[in-house]
């Protein structure tokens, strides 16, 4: 079983009746073999299901409409084994509301130089059949991924999976529900936004709830459930014995167990896969959830602090896109700088950083929370795993959305941080803090982000194209002046592309 379970990609091959039944039978057989080969690949994370050969406008429309109505089909891979006149594809592609990838390949890798004849040439026409098909996609102004190369090549299979993972993220976005407990942090701008526009653009829903609703869910948690939860904490984390012997510390840990179980029950009942809260809206709760939120993120929930529903949604989407990967994804904030050689960013938050970003065993501690509220709260302490990562910010530009991505290199802190009672990661932005921070600020990037080592820029770009959203990248080659030009050009393009 592939990691995405019943969710699958349909493999559809284009041809026409010009070639006769013998050729079409061979086309169908080869198509089955390619779909099976991709499914069998260790590099492809979902089942690729062959849906046969389409040879007429009606067959094409039928398969596109069938894909639209199949909830387990998250996208299509389209390939022209022979020549397939592209006017036949207009109705189907116009009706298709799921993403598709154009695989420009052919069944055999090498030409049989001594045996090649016109029968071979007529059967293996993707070199020009895919160009005909590509024209109509461009003519229809459709965003799609184009992968070129032999289907058995590892690099091709990896590109296919990049798109598959983006399609899984897009499918998740279409059904995602975000629960907001309380509202945004007062007077904060970037966490605001148009939720109706977001639902139109991304598909996900955002629903607000009073703290009383969540408090009721937490009140239903029994002492037995809390005791069982504490046993899980003992298994999963390092916890000093005095946390359990000190009455106050034990109470703080029990508070987190109650909050975790209460929030999870609430989210499960409403089919919510992401949530936000705010330290300014805690009436009826024992405190700001720390360990509770960290554990929910580690289970796959998206999270955004201070009511940041855009980051919560993207956090969940990226977690789905990176399913099965060892590297993690978390809500994050650029917290403070180390100006040195090189300049570095210490990322953290009040409490809520996901332990999936660390290879070390987290430690549970009870420490004083001094921002917004003053209360002892149990939380996990750990340091992010060194290696390449991406910080992702989704912002509302007023008339549209923008995704900003900054490549960073996470490093081991040069010294221990014994007095810092929160989880953290230390990174060096590419190309430098000076350039990256300036570009981020010019682009309007938030102080919150989704920090991930689980996806790459190609996957994120594929997702942005599926969503029809601008994406700008801050990386090794970024120049601030050129980046500002890109922002200006994009502003014109996206304004005109949506019509006057």
UniProtKB/Swiss-Prot annotation:
Keywords: Arabinose catabolism, Carbohydrate metabolism, Isomerase, Manganese, Metal-binding. It comes from the Bacteria. It is an enzyme of class 5 (isomerase). Mn(2+) binds at residues 306, 333, 349, 448. Its EC number is 5.3.1.4. It catalyses: beta-L-arabinopyranose = L-ribulose. GO terms for biological process: L-arabinose catabolic process to xylulose 5-phosphate. GO terms for molecular function: L-arabinose isomerase activity; manganese ion binding. SUPFAM superfamilies: FucI/AraA C-terminal domain-like (SSF50443), FucI/AraA N-terminal and middle domains (SSF53743). Pfam families: AraA_central, AraA_N, Arabinose_Iso_C. Its cofactor is Mn(2+). One of its GO terms (cellular component) is cytosol. Binds 1 Mn(2+) ion per subunit. Pathway: Carbohydrate degradation; L-arabinose degradation via L-ribulose; D-xylulose 5-phosphate from L-arabinose (bacterial route): step 1/3. Transmembrane segments: none annotated. Belongs to the arabinose isomerase family. Catalyzes the conversion of L-arabinose to L-ribulose. PANTHER family: L-ARABINOSE ISOMERASE (PTHR38464:SF1). This is L-arabinose isomerase. It comes from Saccharophagus degradans (strain 2-40 / ATCC 43961 / DSM 17024). The gene is araA.
